[in-house]
Amino acid sequence: MSVTTLTVCDDSTVARKQVLRALPADWPVSVTEAGNGHQCMEAVRKGLGQVLVLDLNMPEMDGYQVLHALREEGLKSNVIVISGDVQQEAVRRVRELGALAFLKKPFDQAELRQTLGRLGLMQLPGQAAQSHRPALNTHVSFNEVFRETVNVAIGRAAALIAKVLGVFVQLPVPNVNVLEVGELHMALADAGRCKQLTAVCQGFIGGGIAGEALLMFHDSEIADMARLMQHQTSESSDLEMLLDLSSILIGACLSSIAEQVDVVFSQCHPQILGQHAGIDELIRVNQQRWKKTLAVEISYGLEGHDIRFDLLLLFTEDSIERLTHKLAYLMN
């Protein structure tokens, strides 16, 4: 039987399953899954990647590095990028590196099928092999599903920040963990003791989900941030600038998460911790709600600048059950 070889490369099991579900049922295809760029390159070198569906932000070897390696090694593969990094510069870079198409996460199944058809990828000369598709009935953990949800959200937020600052935002793979109350208090207390940090806090609630967002800046980088935003530097204007930036970043992240889990969040006004409230006060007010906390850590970097800022999303214990219910369809 003549089949097309397809490699699906994404560090998220959830994202790979979504791609597999979207493939046309009548397409004779042999699918290889890759969890990082190294595995992807191994598959393409073996001739298993006539078509490559590629994520960008992955540990060990990311999608940009894969595209560079394909070019350097002279390997031919028809690449469709599907990514949560939706910055205009990200789209431009992958096109320049040879990608045939760019789809934004979460992608529409019909859009992927149309893209495969438009590019003629379902009519490629096949190889003599058995059609093979991985099973779709594997269970995925809540942490994995929520990490992919957050991945989409931070990508949208980065696209907004990139426009505001006129820079390329380097996106991390988010860390998702459930913390016991003592672990959370220790982490927050450590942040509170650091004299070189300025933290902005913003509460949110909606649809049975509640929590706090903390955005932390290193004081040494605030003047550089102000220059990028063309603010006049003074203590009051710097704090105003941080509040503006925090509103954009936190607001975009939360609105994307809310959209994906089908709720609407109400957000409190952002506060500068230490000026409007302290870390100790934040812990005291929330100690009843924060017995167990779903914590998401994201560290953004700005390319070409020595600037990093860290976003911490903290969801209450009650929110975990609600989020699990909302995302159950992705876990099975």
Feature locations, PLM:
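Composition-driven recognition of glycine/serine/threonine/acidic- and proline-rich low-complexity segments
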Residues: 129-140, 144-235, 241-332
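A Lys-centered signature of the CheY-like receiver
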Residues: 105
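Two-component/phosphorelay signaling modules centered on CheY-like receiver
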Residues: 13-32, 72
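Receiver (REC) domain active-site loop signature in two-component systems and cognate sites
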Residues: 58
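Active-site beta3 strand of CheY-like receiver
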Residues: 47-53
